[in-house]
Amino acid sequence: MSNKQLVKPKTETKTEITTEQSQKLLQTMLTMSFGCLAFLRGLFPDDIFVDQRFVPEKVEKNYNKQNTSQNNSIKIKTLIRGKSAQADLLLDWLEKGVFKSIRLKCLKALSLGIFLEDPTDLLENYIFSFDYDEENNVNINVNLSGNKKGSKNADPENETISLLDSRRMVQQLMRRFIIITQSLEPLPQKKFLTMRLMFNDNVDEDYQPELFKDATFDKRATLKVPTNLDNDAIDVGTLNTKHHKVALSVLSAATSSMEKAGNTNFIRVDPFDLILQQQEENKLEESVPTKPQNFVTSQTTNVLGNLLNSSQASIQPTQFVSNNPVTGICSCECGLEVPKAATVLKTCKSCRKTLHGICYGNFLHSSIEKCFTCIFGPSLDTKWSKFQDLMMIRKVFRFLVRKKKGFPASITELIDSFINVEDQNNEVKERVAFALFVFFLDETLCLDNGGKPSQTIRYVTSSVLVDVKGIVIPNTRKQLNVNHEYKWHFTTSSPKAESFYQEVLPNSRKQVESWLQDITNLRKVYSEALSPSSTLQELDLNSSLPTQDPIISGQKRRRYDLDEYLEEDKSSVVNDTIKAKDFDESVPAKIRKISVSKKTLKSNW
């Protein structure tokens, strides 16, 4: 009889990855990703690159290059500095913009876009999203689409993740990234690159990375994707080290292959919207117990899938589809949530969209023939800054028209009256300040300087606390002093009033185009009034300078009698209170600070 001695297996001990190691590994992964995509997408000549191998085990003390199989490593391409100004610029974006922002823990996402002519019309996009955890208690996983998830019995909060574990995750992620990128359609010879950065709530208001400029309120960059897109094809995966978490996705508008497949239905997607919607879904998942499952797909894949599936029934070729969770049951193009008491809801007869009455002139009936989108067509981007300005001015004016007792006691009270608190941010305040500037320019508002307003026009006089900056008197180019009270007059029948807020409803694309051009021109005037070169001063109440622009004789402008809208039996203006029940009080998306590269990178060889 033989005796076998039982030997207790040796327990493997791991040294947890440090924050510094995690930072360096994240930078290595980004550098490899940029090098590989630049090579595989033909952005630069071959002599700009150098071959390297990423070996996860290289950090081990007993690492021996001779004993390491190539199967345990991955061949990658990296960019060389000093051989191309364009390649150097790409590396500068990465090192001076991205790496610094990650160290400050303020970068939420970076979007590297490839385009042909218009930097907001992307042909291809690579998006990286970032999360940070100071308490080191984040679940660890490599979320590659279609791969099995780890054991459900493990306690990820107590699991130690070493540097080697993290490097192996990077290797898996890079392999999938290379496979996906290799499968994309070839790009045209001449193309351009732009980088956008979206920041989280930790960012300093004045922070601006080198080589970047603010683009928070610029037109968003979007990508046209087919409604029958294979969702798994866009997601690369997620790296989580307990210190940093980064997810990578690829979106490509390879129109040639789509059209060959007979697909003519598309939607336009803002890559950053996927990140923000993913954030909301994560919050929901935290409150719902997870069901047993053998396979998982990434959050980005799920979000895009929901977006595509929700648009199948009514999608039109190259139609922009609004997927706006902000307004709940109301899908008004203004994109803001309005308090229940501020407006009734109207319906567009053409597209059945639900709209805010104050955005559509407090129209008498419960439905309108066509909304802005139906009139203008699918090329209207409701996220255009000029369009958002237009809707804000119309909203403010119509709210003031129905408020018989005069202007609210303060600018903040005005904003509170027609915009839900959750939607109030610096962008909203700035647009309201611009709206008031337009009203002062048109003499719809007139500052009281001791004289009497016109006897031929009916005014409502109010004392108002100015508690929002940026309110400028046009002809003097002087800002009203914040936290000071002023008296001014409001009228609905100024002969200089602009038609884009006086008209109850739009009636043609040409008219809307004209309105948007008027907004653009007025924005330039407002910007000049705010610029340092204008030598802005605080307005002195005792100043003898005129506060109204002179009316130029000989100019005729349509005169509007808005008193007809105040007749109790005819108009919804006075009785404009919401009657809808169970209004969806969904949490609105936040406005994030966004920066864009000052220069675009040209690739043509």
Swiss-Prot record:
This is Meiosis-specific protein HOP1. The gene is HOP1. One of its GO terms (cellular component) is condensed nuclear chromosome. Keywords: Chromosome, DNA-binding, Meiosis, Metal-binding, Nucleus, Zinc, Zinc-finger. InterPro entries: Hop1, HORMA_dom, HORMA_dom_sf, HORMA_MeioticProgression. A zinc finger (unnamed) spans 348-364. Pfam families: HORMA (PF02301). It is found in: Nucleus; Chromosome. GO terms for molecular function: chromatin binding; four-way junction DNA binding; zinc ion binding. Its main location: nucleus. It comes from Saccharomyces cerevisiae (strain ATCC 204508 / S288c). Residues 20-250 form the HORMA domain. The keyword Thylakoid does not apply. The keyword ATP-binding does not apply. Probable constituent of the synaptonemal complex during meiosis. May interact with RED1. GO terms for biological process: activation of reciprocal meiotic recombination; homologous chromosome pairing at meiosis; homologous recombination; meiotic recombination checkpoint signaling; reciprocal meiotic recombination; synaptonemal complex assembly.
